Amino acid sequence: MYKLKTNRAAAKRFKFTKSGKIKRGCAFRRHILEKKSPKMKHQSRGMHVIHETDYNRVEKLLPYGG
C-alpha cells in the first residue's frame, strides 16, 4: 500500500484537537470590515469546530491528521 498524500491547502486551514475534532478559521475577516457589525466581527474571532457533515470530507484530505 502506498502512502497517502496530505492536501497541503487543507493542512494549512484545519487543525485537529486532542479529542479528534477539527477546527477551522472564520470567513469574511480579511478586509472590508467597516460595514460589518461589531457582533459579526466578534463572533468570527478565533477557531470554530467544523460541522459534523463536513468531517468525512476533511478527513480524506488529511489522512494523517494534518
Swiss-Prot record:
Q: List the disulfide bonds.
A: none
Gene3D superfamilies linked:
4.10.410.60
Pfam families, from UniProt? Ribosomal_L35p
Q: Which InterPro entries match?
A: Ribosomal_bL35, Ribosomal_bL35-like, Ribosomal_bL35_CS, Ribosomal_bL35_sf
Q: Extract the GO molecular function terms from the UniProt entry.
A: structural constituent of ribosome
Q: Locate the coiled-coil region(s) and give their ranges.
A: none
Answer whether the UniProt record assigns the keyword Iron to this protein: no
Q: Which PANTHER family match?
A: 54S RIBOSOMAL PROTEIN BL35M, LARGE RIBOSOMAL SUBUNIT PROTEIN BL35M
Classification via HAMAP family: Ribosomal_bL35 (MF_00514)
- Protein name (record): Large ribosomal subunit protein bL35
* Natural source organism: Leptospira biflexa serovar Patoc (strain Patoc 1 / ATCC 23582 / Paris)
Gene name of the encoded protein: rpmI
